[in-house]
Swiss-Prot record:
This protein's name: Large ribosomal subunit protein bL32
Record's GO cellular component terms: large ribosomal subunit
Species of provenance: Methylobacterium nodulans (strain LMG 21967 / CNCM I-2342 / ORS 2060)
Keyword line: Ribonucleoprotein, Ribosomal protein
Family membership noted in the UniProt record: Belongs to the bacterial ribosomal protein bL32 family.
């Protein structure tokens, strides 16, 4: 059975656990519509991605 040679210090234990924290997702404001969206994602309101129309937008009637 594997047994640790040395006691893990509180600092090292904390550094290992720092990756477990939940991080809030980042949002950017779209230049054209002003809507908040995730970076590198399509703007669902306009259907644009990187200045190109990639999605047909349904018009509300």
């Amino acid at each position: 059975m594997a047994v640790p040679k040395r006691k893990t210090s509180p600092s090292r234990r904390g550094m290992r656990r720092s990756a477990d924290a939940l991080k809030a997702p980042t949002y950017v404001e779209d230049k054209d519509s002003g809507e908040l969206r995730r970076p590198h994602h399509i703007d669902l309101k306009t259907g644009m991605y990187r200045g190109r129309q990639v999605l047909k937008v349904k018009t509300e009637a």
